[in-house]
Amino acid sequence: MSMKLNGTAFAVAALLATPALANTGSLTNPNISLVLDGYYQDGERPMGEREEGFGLGHTELAFSAAVDDKLYGKLTTVLESHDGETELLVEEAFIQTLAMPGGLSLRAGRFLSDIGYLNNQHMHTDAFVERPAVYRAFLGNHYYDDGVRLNWVAPTDLYFELGAEVLGGDPLMAEGLVDPETVGVYHLYTKLGGDIGQSHSWQASLSWLRNENGMAAMHEHDDHDEHDHDEEHDEEHDHDEEHGHDEEHGHDDEHGDEHGDEHLHDDHGHDHSHGAAFTGRDLFNASFVYKWAPGGNYKYNHLTISGEYFYLDKPYAFEEHGHEEEGHHEDGPDYFDGWYLSGVYQFNPSWSAGLRYGELSAALMHEEHAHLHDAKIKESEAMIAWHPSHFSVVRLQYTHQDLTEFAAADDHIITLQYNVTLGAHGAHQF
């Protein structure tokens, strides 16, 4: 099957790859698809969705159909297991226009945000077991939300898209906000892509996500008050430290030095796997993807190289004596950032192998002293996958982590995963 994209065909193919326009089905005969994801894992990642031992991954049931010649609708539900419990989540529930003029398209409801390269793709299409550390930290693995999206694809030979999203923002909300904005997230993005000859294609994107509810409050005077309190009540302080301040902070922290659990999204009041661990006022993203397939034919062998960089600005609003200011805190950075680079090579129709390296630089709160400590992740991963068909994959992956402050995780992780798709399934995105 040839995957060659020429000129405007690249733009058309990019649109056809979206779930709203690919294999639309009908009201009397809707598309129904089921994705089964299971695994065994030795070890755990910080902010990861997969726990040690046997478990269910991103098991997905989706219904989609064209409502008429003007609208398309889709519902995607996800089953996941965490801490011995199984939860049912609604990941997508949206309608999208099919016939707006001038290359415009409108989507409304709950959907995956189009920030970056990976986020708007379903988890079962990933080449690795979990998303990179920067995705787990800043987007809660994959960011979906309630809102609207308007995008425009230019009628040009070079694929060019502009888009805007307005979203509720609850999964990206900072902890401790008293009166958050109802509409919290505004996102602008652009994508550019094309072909180089018959065998090469590429896509680049830029995104700016404004999060009105993203800045966590920091109290400057708390540090001095707490030191005074420590000096006067040494024994009480030692007792609190031993028990991890369970009552005050709502943590089940039996190991007071494991700061990696103290700033994750449980503290934000969100589901353990679907809220951002680190938030800020502005999130910037740049991504680039390159694909090679001999003669444009992806069936036998092809190479994909992708990379993204995230910059999270102004993670905190500092309060001193009741006055809130944006600015520098002597104990912590003014911004967090992270990136990854991956390469995946399919060397015959049934086998592929890949390497990925990524880093995250952030800060975690030491609750006993109200101090910020640098928190870093360096993650190296290698995988090999067997593809009996286009609808199934068995993947073996090794992950090595170099962690700073993220103590509640493992340095070496081995994961064996299966992922199969049943029923109708739309084309994958570029």
Model-derived regions: residue spans:
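Gram-negative bacterial Sec-dependent N-terminal signal peptides
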Residues: 1-22
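N-terminal low-complexity, intrinsically disordered patches enriched in charged
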Residues: 18-20, 118, 316
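Outer membrane beta-barrel
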Residues: 23-172, 180-198, 337, 342-347, ...
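Short helix-to-loop capping/linker segments positioned immediately adjacent to catalytic or ligand/cofactor-binding
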Residues: 174-178, 192, 274-276, 294-295
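A short secondary-structure junction signal
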Residues: 161-163, 173-178, 216-219, 319
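Outer-membrane beta-barrel pore domains
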Residues: 47-48, 94, 200-210, 215-233, ...
